[in-house]
């Protein structure tokens, strides 16, 4: 998705102009457009014309309309999005208040205006427009003194950082200058990895180099991670895959991607993270039921106690027709993040999202039990008996 323009005021009213560039962007757009918004886009309209002789004919014209959105229809198989509404801006072909359906098209821009842009919608735009959020694969291509940190998306390879440090040669009887420079180089590469790689999106980080550079670098990185208790690196250690490359230049990445080990590793999908989160919830429900709850009221009460470690929520809840209900979910997400909890927004198009929908679409894994919640559970089960 390409962001052309963003005009949002301090009161969160405003508009954004976007260009969907691939099928997945239609899914993002479906989650952005809500009833009551105004949508401006190019569309085809059938127009009746009358000739000088009085005969009536019709032809199709391309025009730009601004609709007040009344209905949204998304075809997940064809990735087509149709938006129905009434015309709210003067147009030579369409009367004010007349109904029309716009079919949003790839590579054709649209402008979406809202009275209130909430944090969940703004974050979705940020993720849809930042290639880092669609990059399943990251790569560190390196040699002594030179490293490129790259992100590999379905359509391109992006260089996010280049690290260059002059490494003096080893001298007989004195390697200290060489070793200090090498350590400084490794440290800068580690910092670049942490700055540019989203581990909740990336499923594999290739570390490619000639010789033993990759092994020595990975040893250094994880030793430092243990010393500093760097949980992000330690928890994602299994995602790092060491492969051969002839140099630290970007063009050597192609060799690494052709490695058969890499190909088999990349067969996983982004949905794997959602599957694991839901699996963790079910395990907690089975083994420590006082730390796993679902349903909006229960989850809100757990949040009031600042007990939520991980919030699992379906994206379909943010498409709720009632603005007050939708705002309630947004406030919950914001609050969990403020209390240092993790928020996982599940796609209702994935199997795990469908399973979560069967559990009301919202669930939480707690840091610690909340006695009042457990008591409520017991009360409700005794009432059922």
Swiss-Prot record:
- The covalently linked position for Glycyl lysine isopeptide (Lys-Gly) (interchain with G-Cter in SUMO2), per the record, is 162
Per its UniProt record, what SMART domains does this chain match? eRF1_1
Protein's UniProt keywords contain Metal-binding: yes
What is its subcellular localisation? Cytoplasm
KW Cell division (keyword) present? no
Phosphoserine PTM sites in chain numbering: 374, 380-382
Q: Name one Pfam family in it.
A: eRF1_1
Q: What GO MF terms are annotated?
A: metal ion binding; ribosome binding
Q: Which domain of life is it from?
A: Eukaryota
- What does the record give as cofactor? a divalent metal cation
Q: Which GO terms describe its cellular component?
A: cytoplasm; Dom34-Hbs1 complex
InterPro entries in the cross-refs: eFR1_2_sf, eRF1_1_Pelota, eRF1_2, eRF1_3, Pelota/DOM34_N, Ribosomal_eL30-like_sf, Transl-rel_pelota
List this protein's GO terms for biological process: nonfunctional rRNA decay; nuclear-transcribed mRNA catabolic process, no-go decay; nuclear-transcribed mRNA catabolic process, non-stop decay; regulation of translation; rescue of stalled ribosome; ribosome disassembly; RNA surveillance
The family classification in the record reads: Belongs to the eukaryotic release factor 1 family. Pelota subfamily.
The protein's role, per its UniProt record: Component of the Pelota-HBS1L complex, a complex that recognizes stalled ribosomes and triggers the No-Go Decay (NGD) pathway. In the Pelota-HBS1L complex, PELO recognizes ribosomes stalled at the 3' end of an mRNA and engages stalled ribosomes by destabilizing mRNA in the mRNA channel. Following mRNA extraction from stalled ribosomes by the SKI complex, the Pelota-HBS1L complex promotes recruitment of ABCE1, which drives the disassembly of stalled ribosomes, followed by degradation of damaged mRNAs as part of the NGD pathway.
Task: State the protein's name.
Answer: Protein pelota homolog
